[in-house]
Amino acid sequence: MDLFESLDAVPEAYGPVAITIGKFDGVHSGHRAVLARLREVAADRGLRSVVVTFDRNPMSLLNPAACPQPLLSKEQKLERLATTDVDGSLVLTFDRALSEVSAEDFVSTVLAGALDTKVVLVGADFRFGARGAGDVALLRELGEVHGFEVVVIDDIALEEGRRVSSTFVRELLSEGRVAEAAQLLTAAHSVRGVVVLGQQRGRELGYPTANLDRNSEGFIPADGVYAAWLVVDGVRFAAAVSIGNNPTFDGVPEKQVEAHALDQDFDIYGKRVEIEFVEYVRGMVKYTTVEALIDQMCLDEVAVREILGVPAKETPKK
């Protein structure tokens, strides 16, 4: 996938193209259906297929208090877009200057000017330009002026009628329903970050953990224990992951993401790792004794092994 992180980076003769425009947070099954349609339209007309997206949610600038947490970082989003087989992605920096560009100027500068757009695929509720002044009707009018066609794509809905959306995925993750979220995302939801030194309590209890730093990427699911895969240098390890503030111990006010890799005891401090969530195991509980916590951690390991299909490590015979 060709990646352009500014209009100036787009080669002069890159077009003509078919495009779709949006945040694409999560790159979920609804997004993928749109991108599949984009590829079809582009192939039928001999055009390149291009996604136009933003480096952040525009609401983070326009209405920060109402802006939801992103499901993915910009880097994660681009990686997932690359798996959709589109020809290119143009990432626009959504700053104050871009927010004040009129709908007409956005079309003439970005769509017609930089990309030489011939087809635009959008949803029925698509808005663009300063203060969201542009809608599908205006886009069609501008298409007649600049020589592109507008194709409106229907939303993708589940069997029960719920629209597939980033908001829905965020709701599922907020409830710990990572397996259901994965179905909509067409991949395991993941977070990534650098492993930092924690309080070493897990190691003292016989369950050393990799603690992610505060600046981890990706939406953190609900507090609880999860079966997951810990990815280190491209290698996946079965893991029990704890999210929360360790209620059994005092003095842990901040939410932590900790991964215990089964049957592993390695030094990965300072490494950038990824956690792929598979299934929710249980909620966080405050135990009255350390022994009770250790007993539960043993049960958690059994549950995680069963979920991930990882047999217990055999104890060498004496």
List PLM regions with ranges:
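Conserved beta-strand segments of alpha/beta enzyme cores
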Residues: 2, 87-90, 149-151, 274
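Short acidic-hydrophobic, aromatic-tinged amphipathic segments that line or gate anion-handling sites
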Residues: 2-9, 69, 90
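N-terminal catalytic cores of NTP/NDP-binding nucleotidyl/phosphoryl-transfer enzymes
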Residues: 11-73
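Residue-level signal for inorganic ion chemistry
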Residues: 28, 81, 120, 181, ...
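Cofactor-binding loop segments of dinucleotide-utilizing enzymes, especially the Rossmann-like FAD-
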Residues: 54, 94, 155
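N-terminal Rossmann-like or analogous alpha/beta NTP/dinucleotide-binding catalytic cores
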Residues: 60-146
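Glycine-rich, Lys/Arg-enriched anion-binding loops that position phosphate/diphosphate groups
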Residues: 135, 140-245, 318
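Phosphate/ribose-recognition catalytic cores of enzymes acting on nucleotide-derived substrates
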Residues: 198-318
